[in-house]
Design a protein with these regions (language model features):
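Gram-negative bacterial Sec-dependent N-terminal signal peptides
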Residues: 2-14, 18-39
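C-terminal PAP-associated
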Residues: 41-494
Length: 494
């Protein structure tokens, strides 16, 4: 789920952004890729048949049963062969999904089992909201897994942020705790784009952050003619393993016509400093309206610094280069990481600055002084003359930095029937100064088979985590060729 206030002079409106020939073309692209790319282990399918296939809750809209999008991954530091993946299950065309599902493995990703999470009415024991979105999971040092959701109704404006925990590696999940709820009859508030981060050294402690879009009153007709919306960042934490959570509080306050989105915390395990990264959206509303920004806390979230801007987020958006059809991506969502040994910070995002603003590529900036200064944005992806999108970043204990992303390099000129898409990784061994060792992780697959949510959609983000052994593991979505009853699956790279 992603809600963003979009300004349309002279009024403001709230837009729910959810944004044989085929076989032969994809086969040809795959054959070319096999020649150009070194051999590596095939990705493992993580997802399976939808547990919500019989659920009829949540309309109106087009529901893509068996379509999985937007995965996230966390490795259990107490047992690294145990990992949890979470994703949206049965994506809707106009926002969210039937529910969220957790996949879990106890053999390092060779095999996976699955269970519904209790965040929506389609799930056993779930909250009574019609849909769920924005899956997230994070393991603490004692093996407790924390997961969060945006849960909401399509039939009205009721919505909430909820959290659930697992003490058995993802097999079962606790009844959800509601961190904040803004239910009907109010139409003033919508909570969105949450994430959760477990403290890597303090067992039982985890932090949730999200943005809340706020209109000035509960009259939706009056709100059509106001410019007084805003979207501050909220924060809640648990110190008892998810049994209780602190009252939600604002940690980034913004004036009218400004908002944050994509909040995500990383923790320095040596100093305990918390860093919350986000997109700070400010007028004038043009390609530079978004800014990659962060705040920090040295007292476990009690107080926070003022926002510091790292760089303009100059996204151009993503479309099919040959047809102009929209592809919905995480174009306004920065992704951060921290070196657990040195505390060096990294953040990646989509940006058009490297090609004159014509299409998105992958930018990275890094800080070695706790965010006091940042490097100029560096292009990470291999230039192909085509868009690259949905970056993820992680750092291992030796300081190696992996960035993953999709791109359209496999698309041939004149091909308007398919959109071959590849998933790639690159690594830096010099603190983010250079990136090399490019390798294909997945694809090519046809993006045009993905659910359409105001654009072909496989998620605003994809998963990536690293084992204590410095083994990186991407988690990502691909489409399934020619199977419209099972458009997408989640894959794990061993």
């Amino acid at each position: 789920m992603r809600r963003q206030i979009v300004f349309h002079s002279p009024v403001t409106r709230l837009t729910r952004l959810t944004r044989l020939s085929r076989f032969n073309q994809l086969s040809a692209a795959l054959a070319m890729a096999a020649v150009a790319t070194a051999a590596h282990a095939d990705p493992v399918v993580v997802s399976g048949p939808s547990p919500f296939a019989a659920c009829t809750i949540g309309g109106p809209g087009t529901n893509y049963v068996n379509a999985e999008v937007e995965p996230w991954l966390s490795v259990n530091p107490a047992n690294p062969t145990n990992m949890i993946a979470v994703w949206q299950q049965d994506r809707w065309s106009n926002g969210g999904a039937h529910g969220l599902v957790a996949g879990y493995t106890f053999d390092g990703g060779a095999t996976w089992a699955r269970t519904p999470q209790p965040f929506s009415a389609c799930a056993p024991g779930g909250l009574k909201y019609e849909r769920a979105s924005d899956p997230w999971v994070s393991f603490g040092p004692d093996g407790t897994a924390y997961s969060v959701s945006i849960s909401f109704n399509q039939s009205n404006n009721s919505n909430a942020v909820a959290a659930s925990v697992s003490a058995d590696g993802g097999q079962t999940w606790s009844p959800p705790a509601v961190l904040i709820a803004n239910d009907e009859p109010t139409t003033q508030f919508f909570n969105d784009k949450e994430s959760v981060t477990a403290n890597p050294v303090k067992a039982g402690t985890a932090y949730a952050v999200w943005d809340r879009l706020e209109l000035p009153n509960g009259n939706p007709y009056a709100n059509l003619h106001t410019q007084a919306y805003r979207g501050p960042t909220f924060f809640s934490k648990t110190t008892d393993g998810g049994k209780t959570w602190s009252a939600a509080k604002v940690i980034v306050d913004v004036p009218s016509r400004q908002q944050t989105i994509g909040n995500q915390i990383v923790v320095d395990p040596k100093t305990g400093t918390l860093y919350d990264f986000f997109d700070l959206i400010q007028p004038p509303f043009n390609k530079a309206a978004g800014k990659v920004a962060f705040i920090k806390s040295s007292d476990d979230g009690a107080t926070w610094s003022k926002p510091q801007v790292i760089a303009a987020l100059q996204t151009a958006g993503v479309t099919d280069p040959n047809t102009g059809e929209p592809v919905r991506t995480g174009d306004i969502i920065p992704e951060p990481a921290i070196d657990p040994a040195s505390g060096q910070l990294y953040v990646v995002w989509q940006d058009g600055r490297f090609n004159g603003g014509n299409y998105d590529e992958i930018a990275l900036s890094t800080s070695t002084d706790g965010g006091a200064s940042w490097s100029a944005p560096l292009q990470v992806n291999t230039p192909t003359g085509r868009a690259a999108f949905n970056p993820s970043v992680r750092v291992d204990s030796a300081g190696a930095v992996m960035v993953t992303y999709y791109d359209f390099r496999d698309l041939a000129a004149g091909n308007t029937t398919t959109l071959p898409t590849g998933f790639w990784r690159k690594i830096s061994h010099d603190g983010g100064t250079t990136f090399a060792d490019e390798r294909r992780v997945g694809g090519p697959f046809d993006m045009k088979l993905a659910p359409n949510a105001e654009g072909f959609f496989i998620g605003d983000y994809q998963g990536l985590d690293v084992l204590p052994s410095s083994s990186f593991h991407p988690l990502f979505v691909q489409t399934n060729a020619g199977n419209l009853t099972n458009r997408t699956d989640v894959f794990f790279a061993p």
